[in-house]
Amino acid sequence: MEEILNDSVVTDELERFEKKYNQERKEGAVSTTTQFEYAYCMVRSDFASDMKTGLVLLEDLFVRHPEGRRDYLYYMAIGHTRLKEYSEAMKHAQAFLEIEPNNQQVIALEELIGKRMDIEGMKGVAKATGAVLVVGGILGLGLALLKK
C-alpha cells in the first residue's frame, strides 16, 4: 500500500494528460476517461496544489458519473491520504467498503490511514506536552528569579 501512496507521476505523463484534458475542454466537452486520467495523474503529483486539483476533478466525476464511483472513491482516499487529510481519506475508504466490503486493497488502505491518524495524534500530544513543559519551565524560572 505504501508503494501506491508514494507513487509519483512522471512529468511527461502529467503533461500529456494535461494537454489532452485542456484540448478537450477547449473543444467544449471533456470525456469522462480524459478527466479521470488527468485527475489520476494530478493526485499522484508531488505538489499539494496539483493533488487538490485532482481531487476536485474526481469529486466532479463522482457526482456526474455514478458508474465509476467505486474507482473515484478509491483515488479520492489515496489523494486525501497523500495530503495528510486523514479524516477525509477515511470517509472515502469507508464509503468504498460499503460498496465492496471485502476489497483487500481498500481494507489495507483503511488500516494504513488509521495508523497514520494515530501517529499524527501522538505527534499532536507530544507537541502539546512539550509546550506545557516549556511554559512550566519558564514559569518555574520566573518564580525562582522573583524569590531572589
What does each of the following model-derived ranges do?
Residues 88-121:
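Juxtamembrane amphipathic/hinge helix adjacent to a transmembrane helix
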Residues 14, 48-51, 86, 103, ...:
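TPR-repeat structural position
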Residues 1-29, 77, 99:
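N-terminal pre-first-transmembrane soluble regions of secretory-pathway and organelle membrane proteins
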Residues 118-148:
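C-terminal single-pass membrane-anchor helix
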Residues 36-39, 70-75, 91, 105-110, ...:
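Alpha-solenoid helical repeat scaffolds
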Residues 25-77, 83:
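Alpha-helical adaptor scaffolds
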